[in-house]
């Protein structure tokens, strides 16, 4: 990759800005594609050329990709809210179509696409999720996961046609610092700190550090096999464990009241409507409750063996995430 021109779409997002930070440490030439109205504060102080554009606008992509050797496509919509099917299809699926076309016409040597572990059909509990399971829009939970599954299948089809060298990376739940846009887990941390989080739902999720994902994407660009996909997972964390870790790092007691998942799911349906009305990001929805109850045994063995992917302890990631919010003056205090 040394000396290559690299383009990052979704550059102001959590993974995007951390990827650019890592590329900067390697003295790579980086161009960031950001939306016309995007706040570029996450890129402040970084060595990067900023280009305004939109993955739904093919011409803007072709302009942004001129002279590019490698494209990291991270732009997309991540949501746990319902009723967003059309915009998810337009941005997540249509965006991949446009990126693939622009890579062809611009002569991009390699495309690294960030999909999601949720795009992979979920096997029964007790079965480890790995790359042997297919990308299946009908075998995943929620409109977001379906859009990522369809987008991934579109890209794999483009690779099969020939003339496009693309690799797919599938992170689990991303945690860690530089969370400017406040991710779903970031919102949970802030709600815990403010005292807004009064209860919890038993379940589990796999978390991986954003810095390890950024490094994994670079490894995929360097070592990945064309048309192959790699899962980036870290550790399966039970919700009570997460609450205790937040208690340790933030200094306030964790909620002790456990809501049964069945009741929480019903409440989640109503919560989606409520949060939409007050224009606040939800702590939970019916979809997020389903995810916590789903299979979260995930293996990154392929990425570790073929790419050299490594991860740090999830507790360190939570600590760094909390401390970053604190250093930015974003962590609430209780009166």
Locate each region found by the language model.
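N-terminal Rossmann NAD(P)H-binding glycine-rich loop of SDR-like oxidoreductase domains
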Residues: 4-26
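Mid/C-terminal beta-alpha module of Rossmann-like enzyme folds, strongest
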Residues: 216-283, 300, 315-335
